[in-house]
From Swiss-Prot:
GO terms for cellular component: tRNA methyltransferase complex. The keyword Methyltransferase applies. Residues 1-34 are annotated as: Disordered. Keywords: Methyltransferase, S-adenosyl-L-methionine, Transferase, tRNA processing. Gene3D superfamilies: Vaccinia Virus protein VP39. It catalyses: guanosine(46) in tRNA + S-adenosyl-L-methionine = N(7)-methylguanosine(46) in tRNA + S-adenosyl-L-homocysteine. Belongs to the class I-like SAM-binding methyltransferase superfamily. TrmB family. This is tRNA (guanine-N(7)-)-methyltransferase. The active site is at 162. Catalyzes the formation of N(7)-methylguanine at position 46 (m7G46) in tRNA.
Length: 254
């Protein structure tokens, strides 16, 4: 689950200057003068483990792609032509790792802003030798807008984004009509947008927003069953056992 809890190196154990420069694009304050939209995340000081720090230091150049305001050449990035799936907000990367390993014929591009999650997934990629997975550490809206070519994606995953439960913060929710329209434009015809949330109010909003996008059609009558390719997380399993709901939505590009 992506709880949007940021992670910065604790005092007294900084990353190298080179690594700090590589991570700089993801470390801007939310709604800064350089931002062109309301950000769906807020940075606070948080914990990062030594293993995550080592992965950031040693593996960013191997498995990550730096943000750049131009379309990404997917074939060059992955070293092959294959359907590309974009995963937005992968948290600590457990689900992303499992899906990428189970679908070796697809390329996966994960987007996350927080150092702990990026470091965690970098370690997973290296440890499991996941050749079909890359990371961009940057704001997802800007990545989709600037780095993803129109009509190019086979799928998009948005799993458990921050629900921003207070009404005054709903404007920070990621899945707003302008961003959904942008995502739809980046899907190839027949490509899918799969979202999941454990916050009912957000599920209702997602269904309304996705249902209102002309380029998308719902593959279910309302909410969809969890597809086999999305593993059930430990957090989700515990929540279901306690009677909490989880809502999946599956839409396809018309």
């Amino acid at each position: 689950m992506n709880t949007n809890t940021p992670a910065h190196p604790p005092e007294g154990a900084p990353l190298s200057e080179a690594t700090q420069a590589a991570l700089a694009s993801a470390e801007h304050a939310p709604d800064s003068p350089g931002a062109t939209h309301i950000r769906s995340f807020v940075h606070r000081r948080g914990h990062i483990t030594q293993r995550q720090r080592d992965a950031l230091e040693q593996l960013m150049g191997k498995w990550s792609v730096p943000y750049a305001p131009r379309p990404l050449d997917m074939a060059a990035t992955f070293g092959r032509q294959a359907p590309t799936i974009l995963e937005i907000g992968f948290g600590m990367g457990e689900t992303t790792e499992k899906i990428a390993l189970a679908r070796p014929g697809d390329n996966f591009l994960g987007v996350e802003v927080f150092n702990a999650g990026v470091g965690s997934l970098l370690h997973r990629i290296e440890e499991s030798a996941i050749a079909n997975l890359r990371i961009v550490q940057h704001d997802a809206v800007e990545v989709v807008r600037d780095m993803i070519a129109p009509d190019s994606l086979a799928g998009v995953h948005v799993y458990f984004p921050d629900p921003w439960p207070k009404k005054r913060h709903h404007k920070r929710r990621l899945l707003q009509p302008p961003f959904v329209a942008l995502l739809a434009s980046r899907l190839a015809p027949g490509g899918y947008l799969h979202c999941a949330t454990d916050w009912e109010d957000y599920a209702v909003q997602m269904l309304e927003v996705l249902g209102g996008e002309p380029l998308l059609r719902n593959t279910a009558d309302g909410y969809a069953p969890r597809p086999d390719f999305r593993p059930q997380t430990k957090f989700e399993t515990r929540g279901l056992r306690l009677g909490h709901g989880v809502w999946d939505l599956m839409f396809k590009r018309a």
